[in-house]
């Protein structure tokens, strides 16, 4: 049996954690995933981002929604300066902020279900200034900073969801279309029994060619991807007390 290959990166002990980074190293980073949600917003410079096989070219103000368990990596050329903010978010904390029909975790769910991960901060949206205000509160600290940061975080997530609901998405700039289609199919059928032969027949491709292209594009095998995704889904389902059948 092939060992699990995806790397779990980062950790989160707080309800949310914000980073403000700027560099031009262009370090190559393999596909990886987190057990928490993540938002990346590009503030300046040039950068690309890949999520579940889709590659995007980012412009300043664009933000990337990376839900828990989604494989992703930055795509940055050596010497290309880019400044960004990265927000780690605990899924349970985000769901607990739900009021009525306003669930702030909806944006991540929609991104994963529609396979649309990048959105543009335009049309009067204040996502970028809200990120900056939250960063300033965290940086300054002082009396009431934690409470103020919670309020600013909530406001930011409401605005992010408004942008997503408004459909201000950024189209993918690249990726192997066959592999992307396969990734999307796998994510929609994680609870179904799947075999390599059945997948190859569905996508009209030899199984050996399919497995080779999948590994070339993602760095991982179809089996390794499925196994890890199913384990992540099982943890999520068990954590929510569901009795959904898992394979």
Model-assigned labels for residue ranges:
Residues 122-125, 138-155, 173-176:
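All-alpha amphipathic helical-bundle segments outside canonical DNA-binding/catalytic cores
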Residues 184, 188, 193-198, 205, ...:
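Terminal helix-turn-helix DNA-binding modules in bacterial transcription factors
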Residues 43, 128-142, 183, 187-190, ...:
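Regular secondary-structure segments
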Residues 7, 23-34:
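Short beta-strand/loop turn elements enriched in aromatics
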Residues 1-22, 68-139, 157-166:
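A hydrophobic/aromatic-rich effector-binding and dimerization subdomain
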Residues 32-49, 65:
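Short, conserved beta-strand element in jelly-roll/cupin
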Residues 53-68:
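Short acidic-glycine-tyrosine-enriched beta hairpin
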Residues 46-48, 55, 71, 93:
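Structural motif
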């Amino acid at each position: 049996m092939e060992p699990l290959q995806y790397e779990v990166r980062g950790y989160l002990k707080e309800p949310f954690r914000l980073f403000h980074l700027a560099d031009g190293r262009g370090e190559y980073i393999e596909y990886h995933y987190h057990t928490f949600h993540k938002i990346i917003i590009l503030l300046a410079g040039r950068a690309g981002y890949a999520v579940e096989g889709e590659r995007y070219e980012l412009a300043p103000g664009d933000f990337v929604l990376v839900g828990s368990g989604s494989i992703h990596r930055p795509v940055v050329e050596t010497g290309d300066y880019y400044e960004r903010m990265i927000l780690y978010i605990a899924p349970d904390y985000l769901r607990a902020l739900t009021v009525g029909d306003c669930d702030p975790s909806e944006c991540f769910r929609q991104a994963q279900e529609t396979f649309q991960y990048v959105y543009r901060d335009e049309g009067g949206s204040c996502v970028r200034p809200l990120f900056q205000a939250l960063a300033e509160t965290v940086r300054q600290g002082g009396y009431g900073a934690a409470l103020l940061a919670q309020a600013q975080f909530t406001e930011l997530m409401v605005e992010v969801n408004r942008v997503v609901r408004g459909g201000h998405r950024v189209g993918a700039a690249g990726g192997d279309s066959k592999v992307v289609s396969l990734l999307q199919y796998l994510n929609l059928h994680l609870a179904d029994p799947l075999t390599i032969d059945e997948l190859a027949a569905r996508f009209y491709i030899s199984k050996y060619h399919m497995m080779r292209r999948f590994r070339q594009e993602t760095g991982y095998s179809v089996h390794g991807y499925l196994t890890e995704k199913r384990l992540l889904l099982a943890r999520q389902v068990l954590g929510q007390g569901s009795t959904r059948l898992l394979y």
